[in-house]
Amino acid sequence: MSKKLHIKTWGCQMNEYDSSKMADLLGEYQGYTLTEEAEEADILLLNTCSIREKAQEKVFHQLGRWKTLKDKNPDLIIGVGGCVASQEGKAIKDRAQCVDIIFGPQTLHRLPDMIDQVRRGEKAVIDVSFPEIEKFDRLPEPRAEGPTAFVSIMEGCSKYCSFCVVPYTRGEEVSRPSDDIILEIAQLAEQGVREVNLLGQNVNAYRGATHDGGICTFAELLRYVAAIDGIDRIRFTTSHPIEFTQDIIDVYEDTPELVSFLHLPVQSGSDRILTAMKRGHMAIEYKSIIRRLRKARPDIQISSDFIIGFPGETKEDFADTMKLIEDVAFDHSFSFIYSARPGTPAADLPDDVDMEEKKQRLAILQDRITQQAMRYSRHMMGTVQRILVEGPSVKNPMELRGRTENNRVVNFEGQPKHIGSFVDVEIVDVYTNSLRGKFIRGEDEMDLRRNLRPSDILAKHKQDDDLGVTQFKP
């Protein structure tokens, strides 16, 4: 009888990526298969997020539900990972005795050893250290699960914004070697991946080592990835404005594989609040980045993050945020009411904005951005859009679903053979959360590169150095 693993994931795309690697790791080394039902599992893993309010309480509520399963099956192993695990450490075990393993985002690669320790009778295994690049060195071979894939290129953040727990839960910025990233993406392309999303807490701060002792910048990495045959779209998240340098903007000018959509968090439009947040830039500097981006890529659309009701935020500060939203014409946002994160500098500030006022401001902001998004969608009516077909439509499995370059879901009537490939559709209707398309042409009528073997990719761009080591040169 096969051993079963159940993983519950909360939080960001990096957590989703980490959870997929946990599943691959335990499948490869210990033969576990995933199950959607916690009741069927031999191991339960909770991958946590500490961004939202009451994150810790949410964890303990879930552990309380899992405790009933362990009461029935004492051999059940329960593990807690992610940012709350990194933040709380042993305190989780002190409060929830049912937990066997506590691991941080940088130690998930040690899970097989931790499980073995528990099987040998150890009461609790806790490892929330920050061993830097070791995690990436010990991850299993990449495995595609569709035409899109997330690839982690760096972890952590060294910006220490006053409201943010990331530097304390994931550590400071650590970049993967560029050759490792390129090889992983080439392997994914061989498996049919057409779009990659490069992940990092501060992805544009990437500075990865090269095999010859040099440093690969984020702009250079984007061009290397764009040169991999079969990869026709590149996205990345999340970025920081102070690292959004001109060389990255230049890539938008000459690299069509990089999509015309950017998520660039600003958090506030008030210079006073930005200073209190320790963001390291002013609103005018953010607008300067957007202005230069739109010069390089006129059709680019921008989304952002906003924190509403940060300590000391006045009506004037909020008005500055709304002015920025109007000036930039954001297409989408992730916006949240401020809640203090324990251990951050902002947690010591008086939370002096009334909750009803916060809710009202949030509603105003979200309504404005929804209006702007609908305006963009209506402008797409009658246009032909190239979409990557991801699978059946969520609401109607007899139809197909794809995503435009500017990150809009399009549902259309089409043949299953198009799943995993690009098609052109005419936009014929607009809804709040999706578009309606009419099939125009398939990929066989497009001029796209489809050389799927990494060996072919390397051979096409091969260049040996003095030691005979093959370098990848786009």
From Swiss-Prot:
Family matches, as SMART domains: Elp3
Catalytic activity, EC: 2.8.4.3
SUPFAM superfamilies referenced in this protein's UniProt entry, alphabetically: Radical SAM enzymes (SSF102114)
Residue ranges of domain TRAM in the record: 378-441
Transferase as UniProt keyword: yes
Cofactor(s) for this UniProt protein: [4Fe-4S] cluster
Residues of the MTTase N-terminal domain: 3-120
Domain called Radical SAM core: residue spans: 143-375
Chief location bin: cytoplasm
Cited PROSITE patterns: MTTASE_N, MTTASE_RADICAL, RADICAL_SAM, TRAM
Top-tier EC class: transferase
GO terms for MF: 4 iron, 4 sulfur cluster binding; metal ion binding; N6-isopentenyladenosine methylthiotransferase activity
List of residues binding [4Fe-4S] cluster 1: 12, 49, 83
Keywords: 4Fe-4S, Cytoplasm, Iron, Iron-sulfur, Metal-binding, S-adenosyl-L-methionine, Transferase, tRNA processing
Catalysis: reaction(s): N(6)-dimethylallyladenosine(37) in tRNA + (sulfur carrier)-SH + AH2 + 2 S-adenosyl-L-methionine = 2-methylsulfanyl-N(6)-dimethylallyladenosine(37) in tRNA + (sulfur carrier)-H + 5'-deoxyadenosine + L-methionine + A + S-adenosyl-L-homocysteine + 2 H(+)
Manner of cofactor binding, per the entry note: Binds 2 [4Fe-4S] clusters. One cluster is coordinated with 3 cysteines and an exchangeable S-adenosyl-L-methionine.
Subunit structure: Monomer.
Protein's UniProt name: tRNA-2-methylthio-N(6)-dimethylallyladenosine synthase
Name of encoding gene: miaB
